[in-house]
Amino acid sequence: MADLGLQKGKRVLLIWTQPSSSSALKQFAESIAAVVGDQSLVSLENSERLLLSSHNASSYDCVLSGLLTDSSLIHSSEMLVEMARVMKPGGTLVLEEPVTGSEDTGVRTAEKLMSAIKLAGLVSVTEVKTEPLSPKAAAALTERTGFSGNTLSRVRMTASKPDFEVGSSTQLKLSFGKKKTTTVKPALDPGTAQKWTLSANDMDDDDVDLVDSDALLDADDLKKPDPSSLKASCGDDSKKKKKACKNCTCGLAEELEQESKAAQKASQPKSACGNCYLGDAFRCGSCPYLGMPAFKPGEKVLLANTDIADK
């Protein structure tokens, strides 16, 4: 019993399966009760009734399953999850199960059993020992699963439940505020700082040679560029009509606009005096616009078909 980790006052759930001997089961339960101190702290449950018994969650400090040597118990995933549910946080599980050294249906390897225990939510899964399977237990296993191999052995594994309930949650204290960091500036070497310091007195010193910025330019840099050389190549083809780009930046759009305004101004009708549009007070005696209201310069005005020819 010492290797099971039982302690006085701890509640224990003992899971058994057929064909366990009733006398062996009773003797094993009494030995457990002697360690924990009271028979009422030990509960017995048949493996086939485990999922139907509705044990209270987190009610047992230790769960022992399949430890009777005259029986062999295959733990399903549902059974392992139920065992984890009824265990208290920090509780322990000790189970024994027949395993095979090769892949086979009905019986799994020790590695797969360990993975199944972890998937049930238990941690610290450890393989304690491996021993040969008794002939009686092997016969019962063959009858139940139909396994016919000769690589069977009995493995004992221990696991524990985390110190928190499976599915429990807690509030995390996170601070997303900007941390105040104090940066310590390195001390400057006085000699280095003095070398990089320039005062007004240094500028008046005759020993200080200043570079003339104009001396850095050559004759080509001082030439004024020809405006035609600054234009882009668009519209240079004489066979095509000049057309500025949508987002013209070379000045062709402004040039075409000025040419259009000049052509429009040249096409406007001109009078001899240039005052016809101002009204009758400024028109000549033979002006064809006599009697018509004033109009804007360049505005198209239709003359009535009168006796202009007589004038």
UniProtKB/Swiss-Prot annotation:
Assigned GO CC terms: cytoplasm; mitochondrial intermembrane space; nucleus
* Stretches the record annotates as Disordered: 219-241
Chain positions recorded as [4Fe-4S] cluster binding sites:
C273, C276, C284, C287
Q: Name one GO biological process term.
A: negative regulation of apoptotic process
Q: Where is this region: N-terminal SAM-like domain?
A: 6-170
Coiled-coil ranges (or none): none
Q: What is a single molecular function from GO for this protein? A: 2 iron, 2 sulfur cluster binding
Q: Which UniProt keywords apply?
A: 2Fe-2S, 4Fe-4S, Apoptosis, Cytoplasm, Iron, Iron-sulfur, Metal-binding, Mitochondrion, Nucleus
Q: Where is this motif: Cx2C motif 1?
A: 273-276
**Compartment(s) of residence:** Cytoplasm; Nucleus; Mitochondrion intermembrane space
- Give the principal location in a single coarse category: cytoplasm
Q: Where is this motif: Cx2C motif 2?
A: 284-287
Residues annotated as region Fe-S binding site B?
273-287
> Where, in this chain's numbering, is [2Fe-2S] cluster bound?
C234, C245, C248, C250
What cofactors does this protein use?
A: [2Fe-2S] cluster; [4Fe-4S] cluster
Subunit record text:
Monomer. Interacts with ndor1. Interacts with chchd4.
Q: Which PANTHER family does the UniProt record give?
A: ANAMORSIN
Q: Can you quote the domain comment? A: The twin Cx2C motifs are involved in the recognition by the mitochondrial CHCHD4/MIA40-GFER/ERV1 disulfide relay system. The formation of 2 disulfide bonds in the Cx2C motifs through dithiol/disulfide exchange reactions effectively traps the protein in the mitochondrial intermembrane space.
Q: What function is annotated for this protein?
A: Component of the cytosolic iron-sulfur (Fe-S) protein assembly (CIA) machinery required for the maturation of extramitochondrial Fe-S proteins. Part of an electron transfer chain functioning in an early step of cytosolic Fe-S biogenesis, facilitating the de novo assembly of a [4Fe-4S] cluster on the scaffold complex NUBP1-NUBP2. Electrons are transferred to CIAPIN1 from NADPH via the FAD- and FMN-containing protein NDOR1.
Q: What is this protein called?
A: Anamorsin
Source species of the chain: Danio rerio
Q: Which gene specifies this protein's sequence? A: ciapin1
